Amino acid sequence: MKIIIKNKDAFFNYEILEKYKAGLILKGWEVKSIRENKVQLKGAFITFKNDEAYITNMHISQYMSVKGNELEPRKLLLNKHEIRHIQDKKNRNSLAVIPLNLFWDNNYIKLEIALAKGKTKADKRHRILEKDVRKHLKKITY
């Protein structure tokens, strides 16, 4: 499992509750662009239509002279019971479904998605403060 890209904003802005692995339906030029790390997950999110999951706002740069939609919604490959379970939890608990990592798994590109709860500004400030305290203590002890 080789990670292609991480969604660092997701870990800062959300509290991760459950994680899932999903396959992606991609075109050839999209795979080539991803292989060259020309992909961004910042601002991407998961939507549901007709019991199918799609990733929206995932930016894949165009490969050479191939013309295609860079922000096109791409279908995720999940089992029906997984989709229903995620949708149910999302609607019942008002959670967000966000992408965490894009990675290679046996020559297939997979996406790790998560059910997440948004953090408040106070939570984010508290996290930054904890991080600073840890750094300060580390400097003092060494």
From Swiss-Prot:
Alphabetic keyword roster: Cytoplasm, RNA-binding
GO cellular component, one term: cytosol
Primary location class: cytoplasm
Top-level division of the source organism's lineage: Bacteria
NCBIfam families: PRK05422.1 (NF003843), smpB (TIGR00086)
Known function: Required for rescue of stalled ribosomes mediated by trans-translation. Binds to transfer-messenger RNA (tmRNA), required for stable association of tmRNA with ribosomes. tmRNA and SmpB together mimic tRNA shape, replacing the anticodon stem-loop with SmpB. tmRNA is encoded by the ssrA gene; the 2 termini fold to resemble tRNA(Ala) and it encodes a 'tag peptide', a short internal open reading frame. During trans-translation Ala-aminoacylated tmRNA acts like a tRNA, entering the A-site of stalled ribosomes, displacing the stalled mRNA.
Record PANTHER family: SSRA-BINDING PROTEIN (PTHR30308:SF2), TMRNA-BINDING COMPONENT OF TRANS-TRANSLATION TAGGING COMPLEX (PTHR30308)
Name this protein carries in UniProt: SsrA-binding protein
Upper taxonomic lineage: Bacteria, Bacillati, Mycoplasmatota, Mycoplasmoidales, Metamycoplasmataceae
